[in-house]
């Protein structure tokens, strides 16, 4: 198995760059950073934002409303796709005088292009995280504080000079919203949980990164068919399926008919409305003759193609080089990728004895791949779990007044639900370990709130 994505290789070797640092270096070569930064600073200057990092990510994530564009005299060439990062500098109307020429020097550009934190995070990471979580603050919070402070220190003077602001009074975004010791996130928009009326549901959203797991294929949705065909060509080469004939511009119907001929099952589905951009996905499964190898390929929009199609019949050099020197199927890789998720599920089952099912009365759950990771969202319906006679006000009071409340803001972003004021939402960072989450379940719910889910 190719280990280039395995960060464990670098734990004891500080001289080697991390996978994230290599990704950042590649990004600087692949993208026109100058154009992206032009957009960012143009928007910040015209918005006169005192929280520039939030404004920057919102703009680059394509989240500006039409009204906001009119307010700031920004004209974006059509077609403008919702939640799609803008990669070309905006065209400004005649009555909109850009301040960039005066304040944005080559020296500033040079600093912004090369400034990468010690953790390797860069502008690309921030944009992508917001794409993966377009309606959730998690897209902003996952950037480490060290990076945000460095970026902010570079463009804050530009904003202050342009708007005659005192740099000492300009809001320091990172210092108030990040735990700089543990580099974990806290709420960007602190809600008053006491304002959540009639608490009836609690939702947990737990995220995990899959950047180290090469079984996930990230494909551009516009080139979906072409990429599927390329993957099938690779499978064909490995398995020598002579009767497999392909077309570069194969439509969905032809593709499905072709797959059926070679014992493939294909399942097309959309996780959400495509306008929300929470990833349109396709799944292809292959069953080998010995019923032992299952190929599961998830096609997620954008980013990169990771080609690792290990079949039981294909023991190439990469497979031979794995540490156990054993034959490895793609099914083994798939199972290994979700060990962490399985551990989490087992921990929850161990403590509370409920089945982790998609519909289990008071408990519903959903697993979704999101960009470079996956999330598992679990919603507990307190009304069904505890009954109508339960004292929800007392439960809410315990949540708010617990001396452990602040402790767990380092583990979960605790907020309300935009669409329902009866739901309390706990959103985890990928940096949080399963042990910390398990501790949260036991200590917060069992010891503090007195709830036992059995």
Model-derived regions, located:
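Phospho-regulatory, low-complexity terminal regions
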Residues: 1-94, 99-100
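Long, Pro/Ser/Thr-rich low-complexity/intrinsically disordered regulatory tracts in eukaryotic proteins
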Residues: 74-377, 386-454
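Glycine-rich tight-turn/loop motif centered on a GG-T
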Residues: 381
């Amino acid at each position: 198995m190719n280990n280039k994505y395995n960060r464990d290789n670098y734990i004891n070797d500080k001289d080697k760059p991390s996978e994230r640092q290599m990704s950042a270096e590649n990004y600087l070569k692949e993208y026109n950073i100058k154009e992206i930064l032009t957009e960012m600073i143009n928007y910040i200057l015209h918005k006169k934002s005192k929280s520039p990092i939030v404004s920057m990510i919102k703009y680059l994530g394509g989240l500006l409303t039409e009204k906001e564009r009119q307010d700031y005299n920004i004209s974006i060439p059509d077609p403008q796709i919702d939640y799609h990062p803008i990669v070309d500098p905006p065209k400004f109307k005649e009555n909109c005088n850009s301040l960039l020429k005066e304040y944005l020097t080559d020296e500033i550009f040079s600093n912004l292009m090369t400034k990468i934190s010690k953790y390797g995070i860069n502008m690309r990471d921030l944009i992508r995280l917001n794409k993966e979580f377009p309606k959730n603050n998690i897209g902003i919070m996952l950037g480490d504080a060290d990076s945000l402070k460095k970026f902010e220190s570079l463009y804050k003077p530009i904003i202050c000079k342009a708007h005659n602001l005192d740099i000492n009074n300009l809001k320091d975004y990172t210092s108030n919203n990040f735990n700089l010791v543990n580099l974990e996130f806290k709420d960007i928009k602190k809600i008053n949980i006491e304002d959540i009326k009639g608490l009836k549901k609690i939702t947990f959203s737990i995220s995990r990164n899959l950047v180290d797991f090469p079984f996930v294929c990230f494909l551009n949705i516009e080139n979906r068919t072409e990429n599927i065909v390329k993957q099938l060509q690779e499978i064909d080469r490995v398995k020598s399926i002579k009767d497999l004939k392909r077309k570069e511009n194969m439509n969905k119907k032809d593709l499905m008919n072709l797959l059926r001929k070679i014992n493939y099952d294909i399942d097309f589905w959309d996780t959400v409305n495509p306008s929300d951009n929470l990833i349109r996905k396709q799944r292809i499964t292959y069953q080998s003759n010995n019923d032992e190898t299952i190929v599961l390929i998830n096609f997620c929009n954008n980013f990169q193609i990771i080609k690792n199609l290990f079949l039981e019949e294909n023991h190439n050099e990469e497979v031979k080089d794995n540490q156990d020197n054993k034959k490895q199927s793609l099914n083994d890789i798939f199972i290994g990728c979700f060990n962490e998720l399985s551990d989490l599920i087992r921990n929850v089952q161990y403590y509370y004895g409920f089945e982790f099912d998609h519909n289990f009365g008071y408990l519903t759950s959903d697993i979704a791949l999101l960009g470079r990771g996956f999330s598992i969202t679990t919603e507990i319906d307190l009304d069904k779990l505890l009954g109508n006679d339960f004292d929800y006000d007392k439960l809410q009071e315990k949540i708010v007044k617990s001396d452990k409340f602040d402790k767990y803001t380092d583990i979960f972003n605790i907020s309300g639900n935009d669409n329902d004021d009866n739901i309390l939402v706990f959103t985890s960072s990928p940096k949080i370990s399963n042990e910390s989450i398990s501790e949260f379940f036991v200590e917060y719910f069992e010891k503090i709130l007195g709830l036992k889910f059995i």
